[in-house]
Regions:
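Charged catalytic and DNA/RNA-contacting regions of genome-maintenance
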Residues: 1-357
Length: 357
């Protein structure tokens, strides 16, 4: 099929789709988002939409499926929950003023690991996307992880032994994982149903990652963020992650907090079997029972989603003797201050649903 045999609209669609081949393209046309070709057939199968066809000039008719703009969030949610990426392509000029085909651009791409809608998020759990970079030094026995929850702005840089990747991934439960194409990193079984996205190897380059981090946090040196010269694998993972997020959000990278850096020995590594047998956050009776009967259910007296997420993190990553205690306040003063703070936080929290999100 030649480009000249297609209608101008379908030529525009093809040009945009070629830049987002790994996503289902929601192509805005008036009050509907239309999907064509393979996207239409996939959406018809997954969402139960009626599959029709559209005239394409001198070329063959193309498969077509559409959803109303007002109902689109629900359809996007269902696709993302099934592990698909969805690129939202909007009309970026007034159709009444357009000369020829209305100009359109992809304004965002929603993936399992990069989502803001409450419909796609569990308030009591983080929604992490993780980039993994194998260290070039030390025989490749160390990996650097950059984990971000764009819905809360949390960013973690984690230095881990390759052999502890399984418990680490079980703790983070990422929805999406970024790897360099051809990477030797073997993903553990605990990654569950995470979407795996392969990226070009150069995107994990440490010098580029250093520039990305400096630009993101507006600093001249990463030392103030706690990043050391030997952290090239952490920096490489962070750079790949930031570049991917920038690609998904052309209008600008989401606001991220200063990175939390985790070093080996700071927290206890709990593998999948240990987590399950101790029933820390999931019952042995199955996922359908939620957290009932678990350690989480016994300890959880949180009043806000933020507190619920933090408690879950603490249970899955208990501090070891290598973690530094908080200094500056005596134990009794800390307890009294904590009680006053929590009392006020409960009152304030009742008026806010989930401020970080």
């Amino acid at each position: 099929m030649t480009a000249t045999s297609q209608t101008p609209l379908m030529q525009q669609y093809r040009e945009i789709k070629n830049r987002h081949q790994n996503a289902i393209l929601f192509f805005r046309m008036g009050e509907f988002y239309e999907m064509f070709y393979d996207d239409a057939e996939t959406a018809s199968r997954v969402l139960g939409l009626t599959l029709t066809s559209r005239n394409n000039g001198g070329a063959a008719d193309v498969p077509l499926a559409g959803v109303p703009v007002k109902a689109a969030p629900d359809y996007v949610r269902r696709l993302v929950q099934q592990g698909f990426r969805v690129a939202i392509c909007e009309q970026v000029e007034d159709p009444r003023l357009a000369k020829g085909v209305v100009r359109r651009e992809v304004i965002e791409t929603v993936t399992p690991g990069v989502a803001w809608s409450d419909d796609l998020l569990d308030g009591a759990r983080n929604n992490f996307i993780v980039a993994i970079c194998l260290a070039s030094a030390g025989g490749g026995e160390q990996v650097g992880l950059a984990a971000a929850d764009v819905s809360t702005g949390e960013l973690r840089l984690i230095d881990s032994a390759l052999g502890e990747l399984d418990p680490l991934m079980a703790r983070l439960s990422p929805r999406e994982i970024l790897l360099a194409a051809g990477s030797r990193v073997a993903l553990p079984a605990s990654r569950h149903a995470a979407l795996v996205t392969e990226r070009d190897g150069w995107e994990f380059d440490a010098p580029l990652g250093r520039e990305d981090l400096q630009r993101q946090f507006n600093v001249l040196s990463l030392a103030g963020l706690g990043v050391e010269d030997s952290d090239s694998h952490l920096v490489g993972a962070a750079g790949a992650l930031l570049r991917y997020l920038r690609e998904l959000q052309p209008s600008g990278l989401p606001q991220l907090t200063r990175p939390i850096i985790e070093r080996p020995g700071g927290v206890m590594a709990l593998d999948e079997m240990t987590r399950r047998n101790l029933e820390l956050v999931e019952s042995l009776r199955g996922a359908g029972n939620g957290s009932e009967g678990t350690l989480l259910s016994v300890l959880d007296r949180t009043h806000t989603p933020m507190g619920a997420r933090l408690l879950r993190q603490w249970i899955l990553a208990p501090l070891t003797g290598g973690a530094r205690p908080t200094r500056g306040l005596g134990p009794s003063l800390r307890r009294r201050r904590s009680r006053r703070t929590m009392s006020g936080a409960r009152c304030r929290g009742s008026r806010h649903s989930d401020p970080p999100r």
